[in-house]
């Protein structure tokens, strides 16, 4: 089982395929996505990787978190999430994950916080039909109708659909298809809508209801920081 990724929702647009069809897509960006920590069975009782995304100002980060990031030798991050993985899919701390982690045609599950709607009535919140527009109905046209039964059972059942707070909840949309990726700009474009507002953070994982993709890179599509530094150092020495 591979690690997922943290992405920022940039908005929606459309792409034109080779056959001329247009596809509505949501554009997601991997913003400085790095491995911050590892969780191992020997030390923690389970296997996982902790990822951080987005650059944060040091003054906006607590002292404990600053120490945590310093230990991993990465810059402070705005968003942190942990993903369970199998031992063979552990990623080195400090490695940067790129958009090539997913490929066009792959199905993914995306989770995020839905847009808050505030206090909503039963018709908007649960798609109720409401009461009649006339003929015996007074000031109750958009009400939900009966709340319970009679003396037996003498209560309102738990989970009864009524008016209440709507949105601002964690939502997972399954089996969204990746249409295109752009590794240079860190973009992943998926077909359809994704939970949350523009600028919100979402997590992307391989679809659990689809077979594990054979083309997927394991343990991940990474750009190790140490390798990048060695390459740049070698390039400078060669120029000299």
Swiss-Prot record:
GO annotation, cellular component aspect: cytosolic large ribosomal subunit
GO MF annotation terms: rRNA binding; structural constituent of ribosome
Coiled-coil regions listed in the entry: none
Highest taxon of the lineage: Bacteria
Keyword line: Methylation, Ribonucleoprotein, Ribosomal protein, RNA-binding, rRNA-binding
Post-translational modification comment from the UniProt entry: Methylated by PrmB.
Pfam families: Ribosomal_L3
Gene3D superfamilies the UniProt entry points to: 3.30.160.810, Translation factors
InterPro entries per record: Ribosomal_uL3, Ribosomal_uL3_bac/org-type, Transl_B-barrel_sf
PTM annotation (N5-methylglutamine): residues: 151
One GO term (biological process): translation
Complex formation: Part of the 50S ribosomal subunit. Forms a cluster with proteins L14 and L19.
UniProt xrefs under PANTHER family: 50S RIBOSOMAL PROTEIN L3 (PTHR11229), LARGE RIBOSOMAL SUBUNIT PROTEIN UL3C (PTHR11229:SF16)
Family in the record: Belongs to the universal ribosomal protein uL3 family.
Reported function: One of the primary rRNA binding proteins, it binds directly near the 3'-end of the 23S rRNA, where it nucleates assembly of the 50S subunit.
Listed name of the protein: Large ribosomal subunit protein uL3
Higher taxonomy: Bacteria, Pseudomonadati, Pseudomonadota, Alphaproteobacteria, Rhodobacterales
Gene that produces this protein: rplC
